[in-house]
Amino acid sequence: MIDQLQGTWKSISCENSEDYMKELGIGRASRKLGRLAKPTVTISTDGDVITIKTKSIFKNNEISFKLGEEFEEITPGGHKTKSKVTLDKESLIQVQDWDGKETTITRKLVDGKMVVESTVNSVICTRTYEKVSSNSVSNS
């Protein structure tokens, strides 16, 4: 499953980002910039370490982790979280915990596109990406 997600992906659509960012407590000005962002995501592996790099005009973010192991992360929204990523048959599932809140980010392939569903409380933001490159993404 992780092999299929490796590569570089560009955002082609986003649904419900305003409500999602508001639920996260992100301010109005940052939400406005966030709505304009069309991020590019690169997923790569080096042995058992997975790296996800997200780049946009608004912010860049990079996380590296091993499946099932907790790690600290500072989100693009500025939250310091305890995060854990697991893999099931269909999805890469990331759970972020901070200040008594929990966010779940699910990455999966649907018809050759990467669909990322981010959920906080009952608010879901869905962003769809298309693959632009699968070159030079694995160092293992």
UniProtKB/Swiss-Prot annotation:
GO terms for cellular component: cytosol; nucleus. Keywords: Lipid-binding, Transport. Expressed in a number of retinoblastoma cell lines. GO terms for molecular function: fatty acid binding. It comes from the Eukaryota. InterPro entries: Calycin, Fatty_acid-bd, ILBP, Lipocln_cytosolic_FA-bd_dom. A fatty acid binds at residues 107, 127-129. One of its GO terms (biological process) is fatty acid transport. The keyword Transport applies. May play a role in lipid transport. Belongs to the calycin superfamily. Fatty-acid binding protein (FABP) family. This is Fatty acid-binding protein 12. The lineage of its organism: Eukaryota, Metazoa, Chordata, Craniata, Vertebrata.
